[in-house]
Structures are given as structure tokens and as C-alpha cells.
């Protein structure tokens, strides 16, 4: 019985490896059900987001006000000072036109607005040191200043 289970596990592993090499594993990942709850659970458990998660965050409009503060805090902590995390959103942003992609990043900034204000950045350059994905984002500096003015 143990031998059969081990053989099955090895075959499944080989099948998964083959799927990864053929590109079908990424197809499986894109069809997975992504919700704000799964995003929040991942972030709460310290599980890194992938590009599909980032794309969901940039495009979904169903987040209600009751969840936005918690998600905003998790996203702030996931992104702040982590260039690899910022790169995921930069890559996801490439799915949109330049103007639309910039607006998506501004919406993300608004989601993290409480934490941005609490971080007490001295200036926009200090903010960019933690969030380099905003460096080329048109309108981000103005939005950043607006967040600080409104807190």
C-alpha cells in the first residue's frame, strides 16, 4: 500500500513538473478563483501574491468600504520597501494603456491611503524609495500630496 501511494505521489509530481514546463500550470493559476477574501487570507498568512492576484487587485471594483482598510494595510505592508512586490504590480499594470494603468496604481494608492498618511513621509521622494512602482506614474505625486492633506 505504501509503495502504491509513493508511486502515485511521484507520478503526480512528474505530471505537475511536466505541466509547469508546458505552460499549463500557469493556465491553471489564471483560472483559479481569486477574491478579495483569498487576497486578504494570503496577505494575512504572509503568502506572496502572484501577478494574477495583482491584476485582480488593479481591476476588481467590488471591494466594499468595510474591507478596504484591512486590505489596504496588508497591501501597504506587502509593498512598502519590497522592490520585488512592486515589480509584480508594475508587470500587471502593463496589461492596460498607460493612462488607465496609471489610474489603477492611483486607485491602489488610495486603498493604502491611511497607512501612507500614518507612515509620515517627509516628501514624495521618500515615498518613492518604498514604492518605486509609482516613479513613472502620472498623477501619483499629486495624489500622494492629496492623501497627506486630507489626513
Q: What kind of feature is each model-predicted range?
A:
Residues 4-5, 23:
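Residue-level detector of intrinsically disordered/flexible regions characterized by low predicted structural confidence
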Residues 24-151:
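Non-catalytic all-alpha helical scaffold/repeat segments
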Amino acid at each position: 500500500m505504501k509503495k502504491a501511494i509513493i508511486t502515485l505521489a511521484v507520478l503526480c509530481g512528474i505530471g505537475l513538473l511536466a505541466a509547469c514546463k508546458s505552460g499549463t500550470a500557469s493556465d491553471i493559476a489564471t483560472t483559479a478563483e481569486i477574491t478579495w477574501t483569498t487576497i486578504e487570507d494570503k496577505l494575512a498568512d504572509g503568502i506572496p501574491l502572484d501577478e494574477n492576484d495583482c491584476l485582480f487587485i488593479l481591476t476588481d471594483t467590488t471591494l466594499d468600504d468595510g474591507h478596504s482598510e484591512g486590505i489596504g494595510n496588508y497591501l501597504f505592508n506587502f509593498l512598502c520597501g519590497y522592490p520585488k512586490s512592486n515589480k509584480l504590480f508594475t508587470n500587471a499594470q502593463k496589461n492596460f494603456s498607460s493612462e488607465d494603468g496609471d489610474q489603477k496604481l492611483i486607485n491602489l494608492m488610495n486603498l493604502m491611503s491611511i497607512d501612507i498618511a500614518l507612515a509620515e513621509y517627509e516628501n514624495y521622494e521618500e515615498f518613492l524609495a518604498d514604492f518605486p512602482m509609482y516613479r513613472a506614474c502620472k498623477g501619483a505625486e499629486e495624489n500622494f500630496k492629496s492623501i497627506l492633506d486630507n489626513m
